[in-house]
Amino acid sequence: MKNLKKAAAVTMVAGGLIAAGAGMASATDGGAHAHGKAVGSPGVASGNLVQAPIHIPVNAVGNSVNVIGVLNPAFGNLGVNH
């Protein structure tokens, strides 16, 4: 039972981190950007900076579940990647 609680807690934390990362990734305009600077970093290895811009287009427009789809308020919505 203790292992089940621990696994559930780890799963919830991982899911929260994934959701937070997805929220931050969707907040950028115009695709992926990687602009970083290592300024004012004294020391031998303290100014290292590695960034990887990743753009994954995902459409989540009008997603809902209904028995009668015509009466669905999301019926006819259009989602397009530019």
UniProtKB/Swiss-Prot annotation:
Main location: other
Up-regulation conditions: Highly expressed in 24 hour cultures while still submerged, during aerial hyphae formation on minimal medium, decreases once aerial growth ceases. Strongly induced during aerial hyphae formation and sporulation on rich medium, under control of ECF sigma factor BldN; more strongly expressed when sporulation is blocked by deletion of whiB, whiD or whiH. Expression depends on bldB but not bldA, bldD or bldH (at protein level).
Top-level taxon of the source organism: Bacteria
Keyword Secreted: yes
tRNA processing as UniProt keyword: no
UniProt signal peptide: 1-27
Practical applications: The small chaplin mixture (a cell wall extract of an rdlA-rdlB knockout) forms a stable coat on a number of surfaces (including Teflon and cotton) and emulsifies oil-water mixtures, which could be useful in medical and technical applications.
Knockout or disruption consequences: Essential, it cannot be disrupted individually in a wild-type strain; the lethal effects of its disruption are suppressed by loss of some other chaplins, the roldet protein (RdlA and RdlB) or by inactivation of the tat secretion pathway. Quintuple knockout chpA-chpB-chpC-chpD-chpH has strongly delayed aerial hyphae formation, makes many fewer aerial hyphae but no effect on viability of the spores produced. Further deletion of chpE leads to more severe effects, and on rich media few aerial hyphae are produced after prolonged growth.
Alphabetical GO biological process terms: cell adhesion
Cellular component terms (Gene Ontology): cell surface; extracellular region; pilus
Known function: One of 8 partially redundant surface-active proteins required for efficient formation of aerial mycelium; the short chaplins assemble into a hydrophobic, amyloidal fibrillar surface layer that envelopes and protects aerial hyphae and spores, presumably anchored to the long chaplins. Chaplins have an overlapping function with the surface-active SapB peptide; chaplins are essential on minimal medium while on rich medium both chaplins and SapB are required for efficient aerial hyphae formation. Chaplins are also involved in cell attachment to a hydrophobic surface.
Domain remarks: The mature protein has a random coil structure at acidic pH, rapidly changing to beta-sheet as the pH rises (examined from pH 3.0 to 10.0); at pH 6.7 and higher forms amyloid fibrils visible by electron microscopy.
Protein name, as recorded: Chaplin-E
Species of origin: Streptomyces coelicolor (strain ATCC BAA-471 / A3(2) / M145)
Classification of source organism: Bacteria, Bacillati, Actinomycetota, Actinomycetes, Kitasatosporales
Gene: chpE
